[in-house]
């Protein structure tokens, strides 16, 4: 079958590739600067590096941890998000993933490990048991890890799928990219300015209300 490639300007002599305009750069210095120099804000560059190189400290307590480990396999390849470097020590990690049921005897251990992590640090609560105690409404189970440590992202499910864990990583990366630091040690409020993360239920409420055709279970 005969085919042709249409250029942006059919009469142009300097169009090397289709749909791409080739510009002639007269100054070689300007050409090298455009290739090697990036102009931007410092906190944007720092946040870009942090959100794409998260080092998780996994704290598996129950079956949710099995789903988390599944995301490290070749099928899901969580390395695409830069979060595949598991650390054995909390002093080398900046993300703690609490996956599973948190018992009362385990809460002080999690608290101590969280305190050993260096700033900036984030926490993901994975699964219904870690979020709210799940089905274990008894004296020996903590009704949510947010009772003693701050949580940035909650993953619902019993247990949640590996895709849910990867979605939580992307939401956390989006939040890290919006963080801001004070201008100096004496100007402005000290600490990290973190963006207010809107719950997915509220963010997608309008989209779900507007749905008219429901998908079959085979299409989900």
Curated annotation (Swiss-Prot):
<keyword id="KW-0813">Transport</keyword>
<dbReference type="GO" id="GO:0005886">
    <property type="term" value="C:plasma membrane"/>
</dbReference>
<comment type="similarity">
    <text>Belongs to the complex I 20 kDa subunit family.</text>
</comment>
<dbReference type="Pfam" id="PF01058">
    <property type="entry name" value="Oxidored_q6"/>
</dbReference>
<keyword id="KW-0479">Metal-binding</keyword>
<dbReference type="InterPro" id="IPR006138">
    <property type="entry name" value="NADH_UQ_OxRdtase_20Kd_su"/>
</dbReference>
<feature type="binding site">
    <location>
        <position position="129"/>
    </location>
    <ligand>
        <name>[4Fe-4S] cluster</name>
    </ligand>
</feature>
<keyword id="KW-0874">Quinone</keyword>
<keyword id="KW-0408">Iron</keyword>
<keyword id="KW-0004">4Fe-4S</keyword>
<keyword id="KW-0830">Ubiquinone</keyword>
<dbReference type="GO" id="GO:0005506">
    <property type="term" value="F:iron ion binding"/>
</dbReference>
<dbReference type="GO" id="GO:0008137">
    <property type="term" value="F:NADH dehydrogenase (ubiquinone) activity"/>
</dbReference>
<feature type="binding site">
    <location>
        <position position="158"/>
    </location>
    <ligand>
        <name>[4Fe-4S] cluster</name>
    </ligand>
</feature>
<dbReference type="GO" id="GO:0048038">
    <property type="term" value="F:quinone binding"/>
</dbReference>
<dbReference type="InterPro" id="IPR006137">
    <property type="entry name" value="NADH_UbQ_OxRdtase-like_20kDa"/>
</dbReference>
<comment type="subunit">
    <text>NDH-1 is composed of 13 different subunits. Subunits NuoB, CD, E, F, and G constitute the peripheral sector of the complex.</text>
</comment>
<keyword id="KW-0520">NAD</keyword>
<feature type="binding site">
    <location>
        <position position="63"/>
    </location>
    <ligand>
        <name>[4Fe-4S] cluster</name>
    </ligand>
</feature>
<keyword id="KW-0472">Membrane</keyword>
<dbReference type="GO" id="GO:0009060">
    <property type="term" value="P:aerobic respiration"/>
</dbReference>
<keyword id="KW-1003">Cell membrane</keyword>
<feature type="binding site">
    <location>
        <position position="64"/>
    </location>
    <ligand>
        <name>[4Fe-4S] cluster</name>
    </ligand>
</feature>
<dbReference type="GO" id="GO:0051539">
    <property type="term" value="F:4 iron, 4 sulfur cluster binding"/>
</dbReference>
<keyword id="KW-0997">Cell inner membrane</keyword>
<keyword id="KW-0411">Iron-sulfur</keyword>
<dbReference type="GO" id="GO:0045271">
    <property type="term" value="C:respiratory chain complex I"/>
</dbReference>
<dbReference type="GO" id="GO:0050136">
    <property type="term" value="F:NADH:ubiquinone reductase (non-electrogenic) activity"/>
</dbReference>
<comment type="function">
    <text>NDH-1 shuttles electrons from NADH, via FMN and iron-sulfur (Fe-S) centers, to quinones in the respiratory chain. The immediate electron acceptor for the enzyme in this species is believed to be ubiquinone. Couples the redox reaction to proton translocation (for every two electrons transferred, four hydrogen ions are translocated across the cytoplasmic membrane), and thus conserves the redox energy in a proton gradient.</text>
</comment>
<keyword id="KW-1278">Translocase</keyword>
<protein>
    <recommendedName>
        <fullName>NADH-quinone oxidoreductase subunit B</fullName>
        <ecNumber>7.1.1.-</ecNumber>
    </recommendedName>
</protein>
<dbReference type="GO" id="GO:0015990">
    <property type="term" value="P:electron transport coupled proton transport"/>
</dbReference>
